[in-house]
């Protein structure tokens, strides 16, 4: 079954004794290369003599042509034969397979990097479920214990049943309250408008709109003693499409798994801020960071129908609270009529366990700047088969590694070092990437150029979707103009053309939409904590016509290879396009003589964000005046940044690229700009989110928020206990933001 990985001699040999950046690796990969290469190659030879772009002018074209859709298809098939739950033998075996294949592909160094982190598993002998009990305490209904197996997978026995990872154990019972999506505003509606108290109740919420961990946190704050999560057809069933296996919709018994943590970037709950290695100090389980305090369990919509059909109490406040089930969506509390004495009971027996996980880290050393790292990473662990999440991304990473290895075997090397990562335990709170970044944080802060995330390659087949730092906007726009669009009706046109038409920006007329980085994926620690420029790209659905959350079969047993091959991307042309985008981003970042970062795009973004947060504040004009709140300092800092960025850009245009010292100075200014937005003290209550310009929303981890410190200070400010103190905090956050932008501008000034 899903037994946690046991320590073994082979695990030790491949794992802890091969920790990445160990002394031997440093000597092999960096000490000799850096000292000799820097002294002789950097100062004696012109910097562009040894770059691949000069030696092999067609290498970028060769790289893109070498990427093959059929290889991605083959890799995806291979990666989805068995489940790969973090901490299990299957996932360890896949790590060893990737380790061996990356070596065969030709990387200079491939190692396993292991950590002992807190994971969560269901109890095999005491399954989790939800029941309805009558007044005598007898069960009259219980939810399904497992999903039906998809065709062709009936004989695979190690499928973990649906559960909410890190839910505490417990058997709470009580009246049921329907809380819509369990968002902050939903609980405000219940408590402030409808006067419904959730304290001591069991609440049921539909998946969607916000991260499930935020739902659980909101339920806790409302006093609930348990929460049930379900996938409503309105959010996970597209009209006109059949359910799996005949289509890509969610069957009634399909269930979304997922963690319900609120880590806020802490990493392993027992070692927040520090790597979970062999000598790490670990908190007691009772002191673990980010764990929920109330039992949680997910169910499918067939079971949800049974729980909701006899709900009594208040009618839903408006149509936005109604889903796609044939129930009235009454809020409760409790059942109606003859069912009024029945209660709902959770039976949760999951357990937490310190378990070993394994990242795979591959290195392709740079020829000119081996001490500058461009990182491509995506996770490998899956809740079950992971047909989309994550293996559609892992297969693309595998093909990109193979392609870079092919070029290397022909004598090519990138200018800068490229690191490739197959992360473990992403589904349990981004643990693999966070622990590795924590272990190597000092090196990464000094040498990290960029991080490109490579989770799911598709969540639809409509158009490109990009989230990234403004530093990468121009890079993405330029490279998509060079790539062909895979979309029907855009034959002979560029990816940029189809992207711009299908997903236009709401902020910048005539440009495609690029979104802010939030969280919920492995770029978090690199961007939000370390300040390394980051980006991600994948193919997505038509969000205008398709209102479902994510894709319907997300984190269910039905996320199979066949789902992708039959319904989403039969020819794998969209996977290939995503490989080209991700690969080209890495290629440009690792190979361009001048880093392809655009600080002027950052200036434009800062101006937009400052205007947006100011407009939000002006919802309170009287208070702004009474408490003498001014945004003048922030707007002044943004104007200064804009002026300095313009002058910096002019120096880039005039740069003598044959002068290695000047080249290094300007590249370092570009590389460290993102770092300049990092506040070591972090955001209020979220010390591991340190980026002052961007952070995950406090109310939805998946979404990005600009000037998050100011935004959070303003949120629901009229209902704060101490209004005067709340407005002083707004003033403080404005000053922090203004200082940070001004300080960042200073890093771009010409070095005297």
Curated annotation (Swiss-Prot):
Subunit details: Homodimer.
A Gene Ontology BP annotation from the UniProt entry: positive regulation of apoptotic process
Positions annotated as glycosylated: 48, 78, 123, 155, 197, 338, 461, 478, 615, 640
InterPro entries associated with the record: PA_dom_sf, PA_domain, Peptidase_M28, Peptidase_M28B, TFR-like_dimer_dom, TFR-like_dimer_dom_sf
Reactions performed catalytically: Release of an unsubstituted, C-terminal glutamyl residue, typically from Ac-Asp-Glu or folylpoly-gamma-glutamates
UniProt function note: Has both folate hydrolase and N-acetylated-alpha-linked-acidic dipeptidase (NAALADase) activity. Has a preference for tri-alpha-glutamate peptides. In the intestine, required for the uptake of folate. In the brain, modulates excitatory neurotransmission through the hydrolysis of the neuropeptide, N-aceylaspartylglutamate (NAAG), thereby releasing glutamate.
Record PTM Phosphoserine, positions in chain: 10
Listed name of the protein: Glutamate carboxypeptidase 2
UniProtKB keywords: Calcium, Carboxypeptidase, Cell membrane, Dipeptidase, Glycoprotein, Hydrolase, Membrane, Metal-binding, Metalloprotease, Multifunctional enzyme, Phosphoprotein, Protease, Signal-anchor, Transmembrane, Transmembrane helix, Zinc
Cofactor binding summary note: Binds 2 Zn(2+) ions per subunit. Required for NAALADase activity.
Residues at the catalytic site: 426 (nucleophile), 630 (charge relay system), 668 (charge relay system), 691 (charge relay system)
Molecular function (Gene Ontology), one example: Ac-Asp-Glu binding
Broad class of enzyme this protein falls into: hydrolase
Keyword Cell membrane: yes
Topology class, membrane: Single-pass type II membrane protein
Tissue/organ expression: Widely expressed throughout brain regions with highest levels in the hippocampus, dentate gyrus, priform cortex, choroid plexus of ventricles, pineal gland, anterior lobe of the pituitary gland and supraoptic nucleus. High levels also found in the cerebral cortex, substantia nigra, pontine nucleus and the granule cell layer of cerebellum. Highly expressed in astrocytes and non-myelinating Schwann cells. Also expressed in kidney, localizing to the proximal brush border of the renal tube.
Annotated Zn(2+) 1 binding sites: 379, 389, 455
Region (NAALADase) residue spans: 276-589
Enzyme Commission no: 3.4.17.21
Reported cofactor(s): Zn(2+)
Membrane topology (Extracellular): 45-752
Activity modulation comment: The NAALADase activity is inhibited by beta-NAAG, quisqualic acid and 2-(phosphonomethyl)glutaric acid (PMG).
Domain of life assignment: Eukaryota
Cellular compartments annotated: Cell membrane
Family of the protein in this entry: Belongs to the peptidase M28 family. M28B subfamily.
């Amino acid at each position: 079954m899903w037994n946690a990985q046991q320590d073994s001699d082979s695990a030790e040999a491949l794992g802890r004794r091969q920790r990445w950046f160990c002394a031997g690796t440093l000597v092999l990969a960096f000490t000799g290369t850096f000292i000799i290469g820097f002294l002789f190659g950097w100062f004696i030879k012109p910097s562009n003599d040894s770059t691949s772009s000069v030696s092999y002018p067609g290498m970028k074209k060769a790289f893109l042509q070498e990427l093959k859709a059929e290889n991605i298809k083959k890799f995806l098939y291979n990666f989805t034969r068995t489940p790969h739950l973090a901490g299990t033998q299957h996932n360890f075996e896949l790590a060893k397979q990737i380790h061996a294949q990356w070596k065969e592909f030709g990387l200079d160094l491939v190692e396993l990097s292991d950590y002992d982190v807190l994971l969560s598993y269901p109890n095999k002998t005491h399954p989790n479920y939800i029941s309805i009990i009558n007044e005598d305490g007898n069960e009259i209904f219980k939810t399904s214990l497992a999903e039906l197996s998809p065709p062709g997978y009936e004989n695979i026995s190690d499928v973990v049943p649906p559960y909410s990872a890190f839910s505490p154990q417990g058997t709470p019972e009580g009246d049921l309250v329907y809380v819509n999506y369990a968002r902050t505003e939903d609980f405000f509606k219940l408590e402030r408008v409808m006067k419904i108290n959730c304290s001591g109740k069991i609440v049921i919420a539909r998946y969607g709109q916000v991260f499930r961990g935020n739902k659980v946190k909101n339920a806790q704050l409302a006093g609930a003693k348990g929460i049930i999560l379900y996938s409503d057809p309105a959010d996970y069933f597209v009209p006109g499409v059949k359910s799996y296996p005949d289509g890509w919709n969610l069957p009634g018994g399909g269930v979304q798994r997922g963690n319900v943590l609120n880590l806020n970037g802490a990493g392993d709950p027992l070692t927040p801020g520090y790597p979970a290695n062999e000598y790490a100090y670990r908190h007691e389980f009772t002191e673990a960071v980010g764990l929920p305090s109330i039992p949680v369990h997910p169910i499918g919509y067939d079971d949800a129908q049974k729980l909701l059909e006899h709900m009594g109490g208040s009618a839903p406040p408006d149509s936005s609270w109604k889903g796609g089930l044939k129930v009235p969506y009454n809020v409760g509390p409790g059942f109606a009529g003859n069912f009024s004495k029945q209660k709902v009971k959770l039976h949760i027996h999951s357990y937490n366990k310190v378990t070993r996980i394994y990242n795979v880290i591959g290195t392709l050393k740079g020829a000119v700047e081996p001490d500058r790292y461009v990182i491509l990473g995506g996770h490998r662990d899956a809740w079950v088969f992971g047909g989309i999440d994550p293996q559609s991304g892992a297969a693309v990473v595998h093909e990109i590694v193979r392609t870079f290895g092919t070029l290397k075997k022909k004598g090519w090397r990138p200018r800068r070092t490229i690191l490739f990562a197959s992360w473990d335990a992403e589904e349990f709170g981004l643990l693999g990437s966070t622990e590795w970044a924590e272990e190597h944080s000092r090196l990464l802060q000094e040498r990290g150029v960029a991080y490109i995330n490579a989770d799911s390659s598709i969540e639809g087949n409509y158009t490109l979707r990009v989230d990234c730092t403004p530093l990468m906007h121009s890079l993405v726009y330029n490279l998509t103009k060079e790539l062909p669009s895979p979309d029907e009706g855009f034959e002979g046109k560029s990816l940029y053309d189809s992207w711009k038409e299908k997903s236009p920006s709401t902020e910048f007329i005539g440009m495609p939409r690029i979104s802010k980085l939030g969280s919920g994926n492995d770029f978090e620690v690199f961007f939000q904590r370390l300040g390394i420029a980051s980006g991600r790209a994948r193919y997505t659905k038509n969000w205008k016509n398709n209102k479902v959350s994510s894709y319907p079969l997300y984190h269910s047993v039905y996320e199979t290879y066949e789902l992708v091959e039959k319904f989403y991307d039969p020819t794998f042309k969209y996977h290939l396009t995503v490989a080209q985008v991700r690969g080209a981003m890495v290629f440009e970042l690792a190979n361009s003589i001048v880093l392809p970062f655009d600080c002027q795009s950052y200036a434009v973004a800062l101006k937009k964000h400052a205007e947006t947060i100011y407009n939000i504040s002006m919802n309170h004009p009287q208070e702004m005046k009474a408490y003498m709140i001014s945004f003048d300092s922030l707007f002044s800092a943004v104007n200064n940044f804009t002026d300095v960025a313009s002058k910096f850009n002019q120096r880039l245009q005039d740069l003598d690229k044959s002068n290695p010292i000047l080249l290094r100075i300007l590249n370092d200014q570009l590389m460290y700009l993102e770092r300049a937005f990092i506040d070591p003290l972090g955001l209020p209550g979220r010390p591991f989110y340190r980026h002052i310009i961007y952070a995950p929303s406090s109310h939805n981890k998946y979404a990005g928020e600009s000037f998050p410190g100011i935004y959070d200070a303003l949120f629901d400010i009229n209902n704060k206990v101490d209004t005067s103190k709340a407005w002083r905090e707004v003033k403080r956050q404005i000053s922090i933001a203004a200082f940070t932008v001004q300080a960042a501008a200073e890093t771009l000034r010409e070095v005297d």
